[in-house]
């Protein structure tokens, strides 16, 4: 049979392969994260005759082709268009990297551009096939990466209550310089007497059980550019079962009505009002109205973080009262009525940060100007919370849980895989790729930014693929002799 017939058959084969590749591209035109492919063909040679023209000194070759053969398919890694979905767990990568997934059944690692993720009932971030998205653990306060190994990204479906440990004065907070001075030698502080203090501010804090405790902060101007601050609590109808001896169970319940009052529980079981109230002294610079730091004074300097704070001890002044609980270890009752983990319960109250100039705190959260009294405060405690939403910070890829108590906690940061040669990736179906080589693990940002509430669509250009389809079909017909 003539050689040309065999050549035509190879042409039919490669054209049919081109039709297969092109039709696959068209079929996945709407597949999220799909990367189109192109067929790579090579020619075949059956015989080469080389001749030398001795007169001219030139070489002549005669080549007998043997048709064409399929070499491979090559994926085209251009970025597809982004489509908004309004689903916060839908993600896209603005770059060439891929998401990392783990199959918990086989421990096999896969890679994908398909960012349609969701949270399962255990709190894991998974893809549509149930594979676990990988990332690095972060500090829930700062959001900085603390993990060194890839982990399954999991968001706590509920967070336990957290007792208030830090309170923050925030700008604007101003103590009116025009306020009258109160002589405490003749008018001692009494929280029930409004004539013994200039201002009062109430802040809700939390105990270790997540109960709200209204904490009252009283401001007393005791001298020119000098104030005293008292930190008390307004408790109402707290009932506790107290074993005064601590050696047997108590059946009688002692009812304590502590509404706007302070009660001291002595070791012998007697009651008395607290004789003194803990206070802190603030001094202000007369020229700037900013706080003055006095070494050895009530304001403590945190040199590591360049912050300044007051430290308030909420433990009763005569020592904590013990409560006998057969189901618990020794417990304590502080001035706020909250259960403590130890005998001391010191809260830091931040009042400024930055550098000192002539002992003046340059970034003073509290000022003393001739302006209206205003206080802005915040604290770090909260009640128990249930997970109600989740979102991913754009660009950085930090996964944040949103809870019913109003808290938003960073948990993980997405990990991305970057391959020097994308052809190392092998298609596994379901928008997944596998690789025998280990990629470079990256954090989102820079050239690989995360986009939230969007997905990357296929990079297939339908018009171009139809042209390729028609070209391959015509070539197929020609090789058939039509």
Curated annotation (Swiss-Prot):
Q: Which gene encodes it?
A: flgE
User: So which domain of life are we looking at?
Assistant: Bacteria
The similarity annotation says: Belongs to the flagella basal body rod proteins family.
Organism in which the protein naturally occurs: Aquifex aeolicus (strain VF5)
Q: Where in the cell is it found?
A: Bacterial flagellum basal body
- What's this protein's name? Flagellar hook protein FlgE
**Annotated GO biological process:** bacterial-type flagellum-dependent swarming motility
One matching Pfam family: FlgE_D2
- Identify the GO cellular component terms for this protein: bacterial-type flagellum; bacterial-type flagellum basal body; bacterial-type flagellum hook; cytosol
| Gene3D superfamilies reported in the protein's UniProt record | Flagellar hook protein FlgE
Q: Main location per UniProt?
A: other
Q: Which InterPro entries match?
A: Falgellar_hook_FlgE_sf, Flag_bb_rod_N, Flagellar_basal_body_rod_CS, Flagellar_FlgE/F/G, Flg_bb/hook_C_dom, FlgE/F/G-like, FlgE_D2, LlgE_F_G-like_D1
Keyword tags:
Bacterial flagellum
């Amino acid at each position: 049979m003539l050689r040309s017939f065999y050549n035509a058959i190879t042409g039919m084969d490669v054209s049919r392969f081109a039709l297969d590749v092109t039709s696959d591209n068209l079929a996945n035109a709407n597949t999220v994260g799909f990367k189109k492919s192109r067929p790579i063909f090579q020619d075949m040679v059956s015989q080469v005759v080389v001749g030398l023209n001795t007169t001219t000194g030139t070489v002549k070759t005669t080549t007998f082709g043997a048709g064409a053969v399929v070499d491979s398919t090559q994926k085209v890694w251009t970025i597809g268009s982004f489509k908004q979905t309004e689903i916060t767990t839908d993600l896209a990568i603005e770059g060439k990297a891929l998401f990392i997934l783990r199959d918990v059944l086989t421990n096999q690692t896969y890679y994908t551009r398909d960012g349609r993720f969701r949270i399962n009932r255990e709190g894991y971030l998974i893809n549509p096939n149930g594979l676990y998205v990988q990332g690095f653990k972060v500090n829930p306060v700062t959001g900085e990466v603390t993990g060194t190994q890839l982990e399954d990204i999991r968001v706590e479906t509920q967070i336990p209550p957290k007792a208030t440990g830090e309170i923050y004065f925030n700008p604007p907070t101003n103590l009116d310089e025009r306020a009258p001075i109160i002589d405490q030698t003749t008018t001692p502080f009494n929280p029930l007497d409004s004539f013994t203090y200039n201002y009062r501010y109430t802040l809700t804090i939390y105990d270790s059980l997540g109960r709200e405790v209204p904490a009252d902060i009283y401001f007393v101007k005791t001298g020119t550019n000098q104030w005293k601050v008292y930190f008390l609590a307004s408790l109402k109808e707290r009932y506790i079962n107290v074993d005064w001896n601590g050696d047997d169970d108590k059946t009688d319940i002692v009812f304590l009505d502590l509404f706007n009052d302070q009660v001291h529980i002595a070791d012998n079981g007697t009651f008395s009002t607290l004789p003194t109230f803990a206070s802190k002294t603030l001094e202000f610079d007369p020229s700037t109205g900013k706080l003055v730091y006095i070494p050895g004074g009530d304001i403590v300097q945190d040199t590591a973080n360049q912050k300044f704070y007051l430290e308030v001890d909420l433990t009763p002044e005569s020592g904590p009262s013990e409560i006998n609980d057969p189901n618990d270890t020794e417990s304590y009752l502080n001035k706020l009525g909250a259960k403590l983990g130890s005998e001391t319960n010191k809260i830091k109250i931040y009042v400024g940060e930055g550098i000192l100039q002539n002992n003046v705190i340059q970034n003073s959260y509290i000022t003393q100007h001739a302006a209206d009294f205003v206080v802005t405060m915040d604290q770090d405690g909260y009640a128990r919370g249930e997970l109600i939403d989740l979102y991913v910070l754009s660009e950085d890829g930090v996964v944040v849980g949103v809870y019913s108590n109003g808290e938003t906690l960073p948990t993980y940061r997405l990990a991305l895989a970057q391959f020097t040669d994308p052809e190392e990736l092998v298609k596994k179906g379901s928008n997944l790729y596998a690789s025998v080589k280990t990629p470079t693990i990256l954090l989102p940002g820079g050239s690989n930014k995360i986009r939230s509430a969007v997905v990357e669509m296929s990079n297939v250009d339908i018009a171009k693929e139809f042209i390729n389809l028609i070209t391959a079909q015509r070539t197929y017909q020609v090789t058939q002799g039509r």
